[in-house]
């Protein structure tokens, strides 16, 4: 017996000889159920392409979750364009039921789309059964973070983790039940607790933004029943997607201190090959944003940085819904950095993108915001049902000589004749003299208005070379119209 114990101890020691620290610590208690697993090693980490990371219930021995490292994270090349792709013939149904990895197979079609049979990592996030491709392990020098499938851990359970040899290059793995174990908190926060804290160090109610949003009930009826999620300063590398939420405030401790980001784009998480997404109300949801609030209304976001870490069609933030308010938010993306479908108010926000930086159906009211872009600042797609993008006292910074304010080119035979963009008292920096780029004949009925644009010294911009479809407003003749567009209630309807 003594020899067996000694042999087991030697095995554990050999398996862990290059681990400096585990998070959660081995034997930790009061661990959040949305925790990531982190190893800090003695040398820089290289991820292997074989083996399993497994989590077991320590009491029952039941396998709770498993990551197969032989499966690629997701696509690395764009899927072929399908000219036969259509918008869903019936509106997409946002079911309000607990769909998680524990009760549903990731990849289960949630709409009229077909099963995707390609072999990639899949994780149900925020009730989206089709799942998201994800990185099961992410390295930063000597640190490796393991991302379990969402919603697999439960309150009041003790778990142990095993890691096969080969999962991490040069690491013998963890084989013993005693090698890495932890116990989760005994119970969830009380449902009557309307203030939830997220802290990346595990000292809050949740360790991730996604964990907090998963906890909050769908479709809350009033502000009195609403929740506030306070996010402590930290680096939150997570793909965030939630749906059907109302009357929730997500507030960071500070804008620069709270960074929520992930490597996501249209290549990594594409729309179904046979289904078009985004543009038409009620169509199949997009999965390419780093952070998406889908079919959500009456939300408030404050003091956060939201960023995608990939190039391409890659939103930092995608929001679908009505009456959503954003204050002091920094959004960083590439093409389509911000996609906003539904009425949104943006106060003192910063938006940085690569081109078509602001996309969507609107309406959006931007007040004292700063927008930077390498290509066109916006591609507005509102219909006659609502206003488009209205900017009041905003600052546009061009990052290249081709950073025109917007464009309305022919879009595969379709255009946006009711598109609307209004600039009032805005600062323009390094913007081409013609202002707007291409406007196809099919969009010449668009409303593009400008009033009192000036440079960084406050001097009036020379608008004599503007695109002729970009109308300059007169302070006397158009005073009433300027007043209307300056009123967010008139623009947004609330």
Regions found by a protein language model. Give the residues of each.
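Bacterial Sec-dependent N-terminal signal peptides
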Residues: 1-16
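Short glycine-/acidic-enriched loop or helix-start segments at secondary-structure transitions
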Residues: 5, 50, 240-241
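Short N-terminal micro-motifs specific to bacterial/archaeal maturation
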Residues: 6, 28, 150, 155, ...
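Sequence-level preference for short, compositionally simple segments enriched
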Residues: 187-494
């Amino acid at each position: 017996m003594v020899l067996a114990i000694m042999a087991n101890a030697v095995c554990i020691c050999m398996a862990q000889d290059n681990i400096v620290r585990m998070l959660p610590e081995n034997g930790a208690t009061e661990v959040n159920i949305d925790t990531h697993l982190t190893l800090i090693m003695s040398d820089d980490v290289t991820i292997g392409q074989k083996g399993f990371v497994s989590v077991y219930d320590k009491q029952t021995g039941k396998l709770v979750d498993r990551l197969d490292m032989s499966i690629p994270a997701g696509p690395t090349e764009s899927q072929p364009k399908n000219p036969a792709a259509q918008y869903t013939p019936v509106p997409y149904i946002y079911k309000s039921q607990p769909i998680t990895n524990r009760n549903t197979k990731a990849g289960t079609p949630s709409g009229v789309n077909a099963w995707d049979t390609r072999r990639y990592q899949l994780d149900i996030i925020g009730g989206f059964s089709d799942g998201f491709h994800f990185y099961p392990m992410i390295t930063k020098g000597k640190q490796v973070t393991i991302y379990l499938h969402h919603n697999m851990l439960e309150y009041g359970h003790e778990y142990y983790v095993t890691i096969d040899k080969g999962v991490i290059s040069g690491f013998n793995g963890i084989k013993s039940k005693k090698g890495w174990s932890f116990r989760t908190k005994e119970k969830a926060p009380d449902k009557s607790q309307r203030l939830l804290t997220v802290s990346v160090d595990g000292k809050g109610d949740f360790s991730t933004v996604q964990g907090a949003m998963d906890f909050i009930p769908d479709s809350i009826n009033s502000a009195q029943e609403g929740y506030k999620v306070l996010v402590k300063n930290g680096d939150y590398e997570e793909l965030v997607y939630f749906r059907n939420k109302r009357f929730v405030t997500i507030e960071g401790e500070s804008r620069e201190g709270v960074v929520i980001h992930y490597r996501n784009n249209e290549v990594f998480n594409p729309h179904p090959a046979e289904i078009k997404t985004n543009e038409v109300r009620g169509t199949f949801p997009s999965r390419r944003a780093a952070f998406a609030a889908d079919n959500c209304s009456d939300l408030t976001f404050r003091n956060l940085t939201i960023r995608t870490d990939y190039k391409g069609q890659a939103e930092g933030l995608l929001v679908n819904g009505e009456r959503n308010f954003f204050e002091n938010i920094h959004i960083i993306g590439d093409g389509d950095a911000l996609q906003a479908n539904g009425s949104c108010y943006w106060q003192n926000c910063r938006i940085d993108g690569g081109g078509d930086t602001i996309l969507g159906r609107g309406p959006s009211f931007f007040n004292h915001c700063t927008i930077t872009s390498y290509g066109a600042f916006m591609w507005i797609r509102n219909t006659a049902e609502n206003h488009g993008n209205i900017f009041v006292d905003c600052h546009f910074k061009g990052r290249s000589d081709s950073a025109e304010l917007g464009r309305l080119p022919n879009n595969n035979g379709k255009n946006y004749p009711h598109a609307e963009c209004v600039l009032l008292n805005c600062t323009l920096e390094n913007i081409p003299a013609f202002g707007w780029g291409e406007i196809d004949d099919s969009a010449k009925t668009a409303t593009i208005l400008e009033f009192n644009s000036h440079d960084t010294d406050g001097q009036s911009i020379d608008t004599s070379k503007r695109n002729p479809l970009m109308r300059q407003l007169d302070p006397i003749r158009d005073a009433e119209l300027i007043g209307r567009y300056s009123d967010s209630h008139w623009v947004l309807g609330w």
